[in-house]
Amino acid sequence: MPWKIHKKRHLTSFQVIILGVILFGALILMLPISSAQAIITPFHKALFTSTSAVCVTGLAVVDTGSYWSAFGQTVIMFLIQIGGLGVITTATAVFILSGRKISILQRSTMQNAISAPKVGGIVRLMSFILKGTLLIELIGALFMMPVFCHDFGLRGIWMAIFHSVSAFCNAGFDLLGTKGHPFVSLTSYAVNPGINIVIMLLIIIGGIGFFTWEDIYLHKFRFKRYHMQSKIILTTTLCLILLPAVFFFFQDYGNLSGTHRLLASL
């Protein structure tokens, strides 16, 4: 029987960069300045948190709100933003802000990173993505600030910013846990429209993707002019939200009023 020849598989440049970002984030989170108790966080906990943030899974082995310091939470937020935008898009932001000229090779890399149909106009598209992301996250934070500032004082400003980024990137991280009540998430705001609706909209807008944004931006509400990908994404998203919401509305939350049941179901 002839021997099978297996080619060595090498990590791609994208994989190396992602692993580098995750590892760097983990090392920063290990530092005493990153934890609320000013202790060194075990490597496996820091690595898990960094991986979860970059890959925007929302899984956590420690409560984000009570375990990490403001510095640690900021690191997590930036890791979420990098993961949500993508490493190449984040790198592009640095190039654009620094005013550096972007080469053809770099433009081609950007095209592959976001699966753009062509290289032409890729910098303009990236700029649109970056500006749109920051604008939407800022608007989301501004809408949530009154509620969070009412409940947490000036700390509410930071909480609004963090939750806006987390929701837009579909990351699932929150800062509402305490030492006595960890991992409570947004349960205390389930029927608060000022938080509930804003978080929902941010999740949806961030989830539908950049190309769907462009279709909506260019063609407004003329659905027939959208690309097939955008049509499928929007239709599927609507069905996946409304159908389970109807089920939850009639199945659960029997002790809530109609309006509160609707908010909790959605």
Say what each PLM segment does.
Residues 1-266:
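Membrane-proximal intracellular helices of multi-pass ion channels
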